[in-house]
A protein has these predicted regions:
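HIT superfamily nucleotide-processing domains
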Residues: 1-114
Length: 114
């Protein structure tokens, strides 16, 4: 078992409520939701932070928007809308060092987020 909880969910060593998966991405409901809809979208490849993206990740990241759009559709938040967040490193609020996107919806979002 890996020390990365997201890698363990990807490998199915730990259960996660899977919302979507393809050959590059896996999405699952957050166990500590900050909104009625809170999905974590993670690349299957272990990339620690946004700062660790390299040229060879273009294809994965290029598909990210399409995947987010599919998940918003699955969760019925495309309309009226949703928020997407990527935290990077400690000051950015990142707790799990496996790049991931938060999709939040199901309520009115406020600004600034905090």
């Amino acid at each position: 078992m890996s020390s990365c909880i997201f890698c363990n969910i990807i490998s199915k060593e730990i259960d996660g409520k899977i919302v979507y998966e393809d050959d590059q991405w896996l999405a699952f409901d957050d166990i500590n939701p900050q909104a009625p809809i809170h999905v974590l979208i993670v690349p299957r490849e272990h990339i620690p932070t946004l700062n660790d993206l390299k040229e060879n990740h273009r294809d994965i990241i290029g598909n990210m928007g399409v995947v987010i759009n599919k998940i918003a559709e699955i969760k019925n938040v495309k309309d009226p809308g949703f928020r997407v967040v990527i935290n990077c490193n400690t000051a950015g609020g990142q707790l799990v060092y496996h790049l991931h996107v938060h999709l939040l919806g199901g309520r009115q979002m406020t600004w600034p987020p905090g």
